[in-house]
Amino acid sequence: MTYIAKPKFHHPALPTNALGFTHRDYEGAISTLCAGCGHDSISAAIIQACFELDLPPHRVAKLSGIGCSSKTPTYFLGSSHGFNTVHGRMPSVLTGANLANRDLIYLGVSGDGDSASIGFGQFAHAIRRGVNMVYIVENNGVYGLTKGQFSATSDPGSKSKRGVVNHDQSCLLYTSPSPRDCS
């Protein structure tokens, strides 16, 4: 992936927060994600929240797993600390970083495949431990980087871009009294 920096021009009339930062100071690189996937909207909300909460970008550590969500930390808080972990292990790495340096604000970004499949145990234990962090799961229902296979959070009966229907029988665990009801 090519790193494309945004221009650093700051108009003198741009509003600033209590720290003197503009909204642009909380942005990162230009996004290369697919248009309309929703991850850019989440990044925009993170930028807005950090601006409004007057968080110094250098005090934020952002961690991610693997998948489309792993790319999103590049697009916000360009002056913060960042680390991409191996698939499903972001909560454990974030826990270790938090134990090593409690002065930072920890933000974990993970996808539905990363959190609800291979990393579900890591996710559950981070919740159980009560780690001081913000954990954002970007749920788009597919493994987007590998071309759209259904993830663990895909709705039963949903269709892929190629028209394949999700017949995942795991929906029996939480929605249907009999196998015939699960489409």
Regions found by a protein language model. Name each.
Residues 2-21:
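Short, charged low-complexity linear segments at domain edges
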Residues 15, 23-86:
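Active-site diphosphate/adenylate-binding microenvironment
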Residues 38, 42, 89-93, 171:
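Catalytic-loop motifs flanking and including active-site residues across diverse enzymes
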Residues 44-52, 95, 99, 122-125, ...:
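Alpha-helical scaffold segments in soluble metabolic enzymes
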Residues 66-144:
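Thiamine diphosphate
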Residues 118, 158-173:
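Active-site glycine-rich loop that binds ribose-phosphate moieties when present
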Residues 141-157:
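Glycine-rich anion/phosphate-binding loop at the beta-strand->alpha-helix junction
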Residues 174-183:
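Single conserved hydrophobic/aromatic residue that forms the stacking wall/gate
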